[in-house]
Amino acid sequence: MVLDPRDSLLSSYDYPLDPERIAQLPVEPRHAARLLIVQPLGMKPPIARHAEVWDWQEELRAGDLLVINDTRVLKARLRVRRSGGGLAELLVLEPRGEGRWLCLGRPAKRLRPGDQLWLEALGEEPIALQVISKDSASGGRVVQFPSHYANAEQLELLLERYGEVPLPPYIKCHDPSDSERYQTRYASRPGAVAAPTAGLHLSDELLEALKQRGVMLTSVTLHVGLGTFRPVETEDLRHLQLHSEWVEVRDEVVAAVMACRARAGRVIAVGTTSVRALEGAALAGGGFLQSFCGPVDLVIQPGYRFAVVDGLLTNFHLPKSSLLLLVSAMVGRERLLALYAEAIEHHYRFFSYGDAMWIDPGAVLPAARPC
């Protein structure tokens, strides 16, 4: 594939967006969100059709395989009191051993190594935390928790008691229902600090309708972390590196994909995290999907040929984000920006609680399709 030099520049993935287009609340029911359907290549204009997510079932076929991400968002945002006075926030990301956890802090400049922090709840003894060091790779802080919160299961109990679901900063409206509404209906494996948002559109009713049509379902796990939501700062994308995220692709997923291929079905990823999980597992297998459990730091951008994924249901992503690069790898950068302009013109809602886009396998660039 011959790339336009601009495809390797981060600044080429910018687009203007009125803040009013950023969804602050989810629609109800889930499947009532709008759906931009990307026309297959070779079709006459327009480049897209407009529908609702409920109508997506009409685009799928019996024998197709949907791959969902079953991660569950932790209540990973902690509000703490600093020993010198004032409040701060911690977003707990990943373990660093011996009760230490990597956290993003706010305000970061006031969280210095050696600082004491206090986690408080009404009627309970405060829990003492301590900032151990700065983490240069992430810009975060390594924080010491009490030793009995050394593993993920123990920490989850603490987060459930003291924490909040960490909504993205562009969502200004917070509601108690967010703790469930910012989860997919099938979220079952705790570990993420952000939701796999394309899956938020799949209601129980839509999942049942797809099942009745003969569409198959399998689930991978990718615990959404720093690699998904951290801003890209590398202008020359040939040197881009992403923070790794924990992935599990089980034997039954591999079997489901093989069975799908055998019946001439299509492998459809629900969300970019499902793409990253499948393609990361295939990369570990030398280009062939195999079961996998471990970190994935795969960068998908224009020029990438997919090994597993044929089509994609996805949300509208932030300018200059790694997710925008991934979707551009499927449909081409200029075409994707034209599709985003179409969505903006028709008043689609953007980002986590926003509307969706359906990329049919026929809309994927031929050079990017699985062999």
From Swiss-Prot:
A cellular-component GO term for this protein: cytoplasm
Pathway involvement of the protein, from the record: tRNA modification; tRNA-queuosine biosynthesis
Coiled coil: none
Cytoplasm among keywords: yes
EC number in record: 2.4.99.17
One annotated GO molecular function: S-adenosylmethionine:tRNA ribosyltransferase-isomerase activity
Localization of this protein: Cytoplasm
Similarity comment: family membership: Belongs to the QueA family.
Name assigned to this protein: S-adenosylmethionine:tRNA ribosyltransferase-isomerase
Organism: Prochlorococcus marinus (strain MIT 9303)
